[in-house]
């Protein structure tokens, strides 16, 4: 395991570019640093595929997804965190979402000619990733417990990864790395 940042003062000075006092203020008042709105979502094809009235009720109509983009100051801090993660922790080779120089086309090409392909869309993916799982990932990749705690508080909201934050995709890729490795062996 690589040793990453072990002290909060180093995190603040070299990655976040803020004082420890400002860090503590943001964490203590994190709800002031996010916007929340509902985004309508519709999947008319799911109702056709499932062809069951109880599913058509949900999937054949609009429902909403909660979006929590951060305000500018926290967004800039999260961009710094994301840059540090991307530059210092190798992304899993099977991760394509949010990874530079990878896209859906490259992902599809690796499955070309396979007899079986499994595809799924995880409903409420980011809300499913709890702050506990994010904290455990930060410790697993090499941050100290104290730094992992601060990073978790800066990158999660209401107990989970927020939809709309610049760090969410990278963190999700890292959180699910052990699961992805298990799936690769099937």
What does each model-identified segment do?
Residues 110-186:
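Conserved polymerase palm-domain catalytic core
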Residues 1-54:
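Non-catalytic, polymerase-adjacent accessory regions of viral genome-replication enzymes
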Residues 18-26, 42, 61-63, 67, ...:
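Localized chelating/binding microdomains
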Residues 1-12, 99-100, 104, 142, ...:
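An N-terminal domain-start capping segment
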Residues 34-78, 95-97, 153-173:
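Short, conserved non-catalytic motifs in the polymerase core
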Residues 73-120, 124, 169:
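Active-site-proximal segment of RNA-dependent polymerases
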Residues 7-8, 80, 133-137:
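A general alpha-helix detector
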Residues 25-32, 98-100, 149-156:
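Short linear loop/turn motifs
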């Amino acid at each position: 395991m690589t040793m990453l940042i072990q002290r909060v003062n180093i995190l603040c000075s070299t990655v976040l570019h803020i004082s420890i006092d400002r860090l503590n203020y943001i964490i203590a008042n994190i709800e002031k640093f996010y916007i929340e709105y509902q985004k309508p979502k519709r999947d008319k094809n799911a109702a056709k595929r499932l062809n069951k009235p109880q599913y058509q009720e949900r999937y054949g109509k609009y429902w909403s997804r909660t979006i929590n983009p951060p305000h500018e100051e926290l967004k800039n801090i999260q961009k710094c965190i994301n840059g540090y993660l991307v530059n210092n922790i190798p992304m899993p080779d099977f991760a394509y979402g949010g990874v530079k120089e990878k896209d859906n086309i490259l992902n599809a090409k690796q499955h070309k000619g396979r007899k079986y392909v499994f595809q799924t869309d995880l409903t409420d993916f980011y809300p499913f990733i709890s702050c506990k799982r994010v904290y455990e990932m930060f410790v697993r990749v090499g941050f100290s417990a104290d730094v992992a705690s601060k990073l978790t508080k800066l990158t999660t909201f209401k107990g989970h990864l927020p939809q709309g934050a610049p760090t969410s995709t990278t963190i999700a890729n890292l959180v699910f790395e052990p699961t992805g490795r298990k799936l690769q062996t099937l």
